[in-house]
């Protein structure tokens, strides 16, 4: 952290229990047999297009995006950094209201969809084709008024990643992450032993992330968010999605998926949804007052 950051104290050595726990969970996940990293999965144009089309046909999608944008309170004309900005979910609306937006996105497939979305929206922004871990401070330029990382915390050394966010921001940092296991993770935990003869360790969750920040001397707000279930029209649709997601390659694995979803899907007003609920968290703090328990200013 920068020594001049208001409210942040360097006098006590930082403990690393939660930071190391995050690293261990990420390492366990990446070494799981059959696991495909998020970077690999989202560098597939078919996966990106499938998610993009599906999400934007859901009635709840735009409402969720609007709620997140409103919760961040980013003023018109602000200088904004969107880490792992994907197809422009937050970046394009912010650019449309006059913000100077920079998107860091390592996936070529995501950047391709982002460029298409920019062309149709008539807005412009800066795109840096890189991982957050590989970006230098000189590439980022002047400090940002807001930094966003929405479901893009794939980095194993979360402490270094958060340090860099704190250092390049003169306003607020906003992290969106899983508070409870998302539906796809619950499916993976249920099916990975049957498909790959291994346990699925899952992602570290928002409680771990908040504790990492606390260890670093950052008193962040955590606001829970309820997530709407993904709607499918047929069992075939969900089997196709998870056949790819769960690194399947055989007809036997497809039958395991079909049998599982036959019992786990239930009807809703719009189609079929997976049983169970998922919650996420919006974690945010003021970088100029990171060490103060009062983060309302």
Regions from the PLM with identified roles:
Residues 179-199, 226:
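Short, glycine-/aromatic-enriched active-site segment of Class I SAM-dependent methyltransferases
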Residues 170-181:
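Conserved beta-strand signature within the Rossmann-like core of class I S-adenosyl-L-methionine
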Residues 219-297:
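Conserved Class I S-adenosyl-L-methionine
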Residues 202-217, 221:
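Short alpha-helix
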Residues 87-134:
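Class I SAM-dependent methyltransferase SAM/SAH-binding core
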Residues 153-168:
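A short, conserved alpha-helix within the catalytic core of class I
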Residues 2-74, 77-86:
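Conserved class I S-adenosyl-L-methionine
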């Amino acid at each position: 952290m920068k020594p001049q950051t208001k409210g942040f104290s360097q006098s006590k050595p930082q403990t690393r229990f939660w930071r190391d726990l995050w690293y261990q969970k990420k390492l366990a996940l990446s070494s799981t047999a059959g696991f495909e990293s998020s970077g690999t999965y989202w560098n597939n144009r078919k996966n990106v297009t499938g998610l993009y089309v599906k999400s934007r046909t859901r009635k709840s999608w735009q409402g969720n995006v609007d709620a997140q944008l409103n919760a961040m309170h980013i003023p018109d004309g602000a200088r904004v950094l969107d880490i792992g900005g994907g197809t422009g979910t937050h970046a394009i609306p912010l650019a449309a209201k006059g913000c100077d937006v920079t998107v860091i996105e390592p996936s070529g497939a995501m950047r391709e969809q982002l460029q298409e979305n920019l062309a149709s929206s008539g807005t412009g922004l800066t795109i840096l084709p890189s991982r957050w871990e590989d970006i230098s401070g000189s590439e980022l330029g002047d400090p940002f008024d807001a930094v966003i990382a929405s479901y893009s915390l794939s980095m194993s050394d979360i402490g270094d990643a958060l340090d860099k966010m704190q250092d390049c921001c003169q306003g607020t940092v906003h992290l969106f992450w899983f508070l409870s296991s998302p539906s796809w993770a619950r499916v993976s935990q249920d099916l990975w032993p049957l498909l790959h003869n291994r346990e699925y360790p899952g992602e570290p969750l928002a409680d771990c992330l908040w504790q990492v920040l606390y260890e670093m001397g950052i008193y962040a707000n955590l606001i829970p968010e309820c997530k709407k279930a993904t709607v499918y029209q047929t069992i075939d649709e969900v089997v196709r999605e998870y056949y790819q997601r769960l690194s399947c390659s055989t007809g036997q694995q497809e039958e395991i998926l079909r049998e599982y979803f036959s019992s786990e899907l239930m009807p809703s007003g719009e189609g079929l949804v997976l049983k169970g609920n998922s919650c996420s968290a919006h974690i945010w703090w003021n970088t100029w007052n990171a060490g103060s328990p009062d983060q309302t200013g």
